[in-house]
Design a protein with these regions (language model features):
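Short, low-complexity disordered leader/linker segments with a strong preference
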Residues: 1-49
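Loop/turn elements at helix/coil->beta-strand transitions in domains of secreted/extracellular proteins
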Residues: 49-52, 74-75, 99-102, 174-178, ...
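Periplasmic-binding protein-like
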Residues: 133, 146-149, 228-232, 274-300
């Protein structure tokens, strides 16, 4: 046990050091080119390399790869992997100096930081054309995409939001009527639960409790974040393994009681395509859901470095992001790429959703997961 605790402490220190260094840590590694190439020179060298290998947590990479191949004549070998599979594969390959991906699109920021960035397996690269375009907060590590999960309700009986405060989700009238993807099935859901135990969000939850009930929250756990998680789960929370299935369960018409869930905002498109009744709630106190990034980074032992840089740049343009931009709830870190009609920009969601803090997640998620596993129903 002591050895395990020592290893955890050392890993946490590594991550903290990477954070303290910020862009100064990643930029020198990413800048190991002989010289800064013009766009024409980059294209020529990339075409000479002839191919690029990418691991991605999103299957839509295949559509972008096909268009990139047509445009530049560079072959793309794209593999679609689950979060954990990608992290383990890159750890094994780069750690063992085995040739694999040239760059990756990855999520689950706490694990990515602790297992891939801190050991130096991933390298931050920002295309020169994007330095003045992408907001600084999305540059290190470079965000490719932002995805949101929002409280969404069955709107057949009412068009008005069914809750205004997250503590309502712990009240008896909603027992057994709320659905959420099992945090064991997806790291970003575990990340959300972890983030609301942070000092900032625990304080906001405590304030929201007082606003709802006009009294101070009496704690039976570490803080208001843990308290909300406990009461949320103990209120008959229905855990699923698919946001698609959850959206169908919530949105199906003809239900005797109104239901709601916390799932990906992009599923609201099913309102029309699957004849469902789904509406988001965007003004819930103190949060209406959460938002998380997918990072795009080069591997430390990338072979086709110029082709990787060219493809990364392409994916950050409106043309390259097209496979993702066709739906609501998918946002490029490049704010010049238009959002879907009826959607809101990232700036709207940023003030309403819980973001990820990779360092806090890396240091605290295990404790929150253990807490959730021990909740008694």
């Amino acid at each position: 046990m002591k050895k395990l605790m020592l290893v955890s402490m050392l890993l946490a220190i590594m991550v903290a050091s990477a954070f303290a260094a910020g862009s100064q840590e990643a930029a020198p590694i990413a800048a190991q080119a002989e010289k800064v190439l013009t766009q024409e020179e980059l294209i020529a060298v990339a075409q000479a390399e002839g191919k690029v290998v990418v691991y991605s947590i999103t299957s839509r990479i295949s559509g972008a790869a096909a268009e990139f191949e047509k445009k530049y004549g560079i072959k793309v070998e794209a593999s679609n992997l689950k979060d954990g599979e990608l992290i383990e594969k890159v750890t094994r390959e780069v750690g063992g100096n085995i040739q694999g991906a040239d760059f990756v699109i990855c999520q689950d920021s706490g694990r990515v930081y602790g297992q891939l960035i801190a050991p130096g397996y991933l390298v931050n690269y920002i295309p020169p054309s994007m330095v003045s375009v992408i907001p600084p907060e999305y540059q290190n590590p470079l965000n490719f995409q932002l995805i949101n999960k929002v409280f969404i309700f069955n709107s057949e009986k009412t068009q008005q939001p069914v809750i205004q405060n997250v503590w309502e989700a712990t009240e008896p009238q909603w027992k057994g009527l709320i659905q959420f993807k099992d945090p064991k099935a997806e790291g970003v859901n575990a990340n959300f639960l972890t983030m609301i135990t942070s000092p900032e969000w625990a304080a906001r939850l405590e304030q929201a409790y007082k606003a709802r009930y006009n009294k101070k929250l009496v704690l039976t756990t570490r803080n208001a974040g843990y308290e909300w998680i406990k009461m949320f789960f103990q209120n008959g929370l229905v855990l699923g393994n698919s946001d698609t299935k959850i959206s169908e369960n919530i949105g199906i018409k003809g239900q005797p009681k109104t239901t709601f869930g916390l799932f990906v905002y992009s599923k609201t498109r099913y309102d029309a395509t699957k004849n469902l009744a789904l509406l988001p709630m965007t003004e819930v106190v103190p949060f209406s859901g959460f938002i998380y990034p997918a990072f795009i980074m080069m591997t430390q032992n990338a072979k086709n470095t110029h082709a990787a840089k060219l493809f990364i740049e392409y994916l950050l343009t409106a043309e390259g992001f097209k496979p993702w931009s066709k739906d609501v709830g998918s946002y490029s870190s490049n704010p010049t790429i238009p959002i879907n009609e009826g959607d809101h920009p990232v700036s709207f969601w940023a003030s309403r959703l819980v973001p990820e803090d990779p360092q806090f997640l890396f240091e605290n998620r295990a404790a929150v997961e253990e807490f959730v596993n021990n909740i008694t129903f």
